[in-house]
């Protein structure tokens, strides 16, 4: 059995997440589970019924808190992948936790850790040795400066520049 991916609770963001997953070329099938999406293979309350046919699932909610909550529920049955667009750059020493979604042309630098269910937007840069918490949404063009910490559930505006030192002066 190959890898099959469910995109759960996707609302508007699901189409983009599907394109990111397709760019990776590692899923033989990608489907949606959502109460409001035309073409979804099922409703949210039925998500468990697709296991073991589908072995991977990821939440694609716009809201980081909701995304994190859904991924926590899903991990009881499914593998929660890290999705990264083929046009993103991720350092080999970076650590991306389950449920991360990295959009095109984003960069994750050396020694950085990206928390669970965090979205790194297109053209965003997480520089060296940063810690980005769980459930964050770094919108397009966000820059997280070297050795910064981004608190859990942070949501930025496009083009934001963040610096909160990991070390005390």
Regions found by a protein language model. Give the residues of each.
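Terminal amphipathic alpha-helical/low-complexity segments used for targeting or macromolecular assembly
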Residues: 1-86
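Structural signal for interior beta-strand "rungs" in well-ordered beta-sheet cores
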Residues: 82-169
């Amino acid at each position: 059995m190959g890898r099959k991916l469910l995109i759960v609770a996707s609302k508007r963001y699901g189409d983009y997440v599907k394109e990111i997953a397709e760019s990776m070329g590692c899923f033989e099938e990608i489907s949606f589970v959502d109460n409001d999406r035309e073409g979804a293979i099922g409703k949210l309350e039925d998500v468990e019924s697709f296991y073991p046919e589908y072995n991977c699932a990821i939440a694609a909610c716009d809201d980081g808190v909701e995304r994190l909550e859904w991924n926590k529920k899903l991990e009881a049955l499914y593998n929660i992948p890290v999705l990264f667009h083929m046009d993103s750059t991720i350092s080999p020493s970076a650590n991306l936790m389950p449920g991360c979604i990295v959009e095109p042309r984003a960069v994750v630098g050396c020694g950085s850790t990206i928390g669970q269910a965090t979205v790194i937007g297109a053209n965003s840069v997480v520089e060296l040795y940063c810690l980005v918490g769980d459930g964050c949404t770094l919108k397009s063009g966000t820059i997280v400066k070297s050795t910064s910490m981004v608190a859990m559930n942070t949501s930025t505006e496009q083009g934001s520049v963040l610096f909160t030192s990991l070390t005390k002066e």
